[in-house]
Amino acid sequence: MHENQQPQTEAFELSAAEREAIEHEKHHYEDPRAASIEALKIVQKQRGWVPDGAIYAIADVLGIPASDVEGVATFYSQIFRQPVGRHVIRYCDSVVCHITGYQGIQAALEKNLNIKPGQTTFDGRFTLLPTCCLGNCDKGPNMMIDEDTHSHLTPEAIPELLERYK
């Protein structure tokens, strides 16, 4: 099987809008591999995650090996390779947030959501993911829900914060 050929068991097709957006991005770069991160973001924005079949479809549009696209997809923690909840919670577990008490935040999240890191709530509302650093070290402990950064967190603030995200 050719490296870019998609296995027959995984039927996947980019939408016309996804294909057009990826083609548009491709022309902004001298090397089409450079467009792979943008292509992955395009698919994720439409689907919520990047299924295996999308890797092959993106590689086909960009004219590069699927292994190159997979390498980019697995390098960046913001690209989801499995389904996630409607809201993704990323709590910082760096050394600085450790010092400022992320463990209490993690425990409060686990208790309120009834899940462990890497899991999604039964109703599909939240996925809980640890992350190395959110780049907001002077305001720890920190976490992000979707694109919203929350700083100077306390375990007591977690229930009310979660209620904002339906």
From Swiss-Prot:
Signal peptide: none annotated. NDH-1 shuttles electrons from NADH, via FMN and iron-sulfur (Fe-S) centers, to quinones in the respiratory chain. The immediate electron acceptor for the enzyme in this species is believed to be ubiquinone. Couples the redox reaction to proton translocation (for every two electrons transferred, four hydrogen ions are translocated across the cytoplasmic membrane), and thus conserves the redox energy in a proton gradient. The gene is nuoE. Composed of 13 different subunits. Subunits NuoCD, E, F, and G constitute the peripheral sector of the complex. It is an enzyme of class 7 (translocase). InterPro entries: NuoE-like, NuoE_dom, NuoE_N, Thioredoxin-like_sf. The keyword Cell membrane does not apply. GO terms for molecular function: 2 iron, 2 sulfur cluster binding; metal ion binding; oxidoreductase activity; quinone binding. Gene3D superfamilies: Glutaredoxin, NADH-quinone oxidoreductase subunit E. It catalyses: a quinone + NADH + 5 H(+)(in) = a quinol + NAD(+) + 4 H(+)(out). Its EC number is 7.1.1.-. One of its GO terms (biological process) is respiratory electron transport chain. Keywords: 2Fe-2S, Iron, Iron-sulfur, Metal-binding, NAD, Quinone, Translocase, Ubiquinone. Binds 1 [2Fe-2S] cluster. Its cofactor is [2Fe-2S] cluster. This is NADH-quinone oxidoreductase subunit E.
